[in-house]
A protein has these predicted regions:
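Intrinsically disordered, low-complexity regulatory/linker segments
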Residues: 1-189
């Protein structure tokens, strides 16, 4: 069977049949609309369904991206603000894809940060994770984004990785190195 109803297509794609019907009617995806009396029947070719299904697998939601990174909402937002990941707009995504981040970008970010670990022996009280780069630890809000960018560009490299932590949540940085960055950024009067 090459042509599928909107219900069958929706089930295979992992979305509601109403979205499939709407996408065909608005020509967002290719399909057939046949009108019989008062009823409008929508059918979608199996190849189109498979293409949409594959496209949907390439993207991850914000929640899934955070889970893969192993970070809180606040840390995730700071990573986004510092340019770690590009949030795709609806126009940049394929038809019927609602997730905003490319899965390969998220995985590449995790790999890049984990590969950047440069082990050094320092006192554990000076260790800081992503969650510690905050106002609570004495870092001004304006400097947080700059520090995150330096971490992303590997100007500040992690000194340790806690075993068993998911994503980048186990990375530990030298807090004195982070504090030194703040001193560099402070304007001199």
């Amino acid at each position: 069977k090459c042509w599928l109803t909107s219900q069958e297509a929706g089930r295979l794609m992992g979305i509601g049949s109403e979205l499939v019907r709407s996408a065909v009617i608005t020509s967002e995806i290719v399909g057939k609309v046949s009108i019989k009396g008062q009823n409008r029947f929508v059918s979608v070719h199996r190849d189109v369904v498979e293409t949409v299904r594959q496209n949907r697998l390439l993207y991850v939601t914000t929640t899934e991206a955070r889970r893969r990174l192993g970070v809180s909402k606040l840390v995730f937002e700071r990573l986004i603000q510092s340019g770690a990941l590009e949030k795709k707009t609806k126009a940049q995504r394929p038809a019927l894809v609602s997730a905003e981040f490319l899965a390969k970008d998220v995985d590449a970010l995790v790999s890049r940060l984990l590969e950047g670990v440069l082990p050094r022996q320092i006192e554990k009280s000076l260790w800081a994770g992503f969650q510690d780069i905050s106002i609570k630890r004495g870092i001004p809000d304006a400097s947080i984004c700059v520090i995150m960018q330096k971490i992303l560009h590997q100007e500040i490299r992690p000194i340790a990785l806690l075993p068993g932590a998911s994503g980048v949540s186990g990375l530990r940085f030298d807090f004195s190195e982070i504090k030194a960055c703040i001193a560099e950024d402070e304007p001199e009067y």
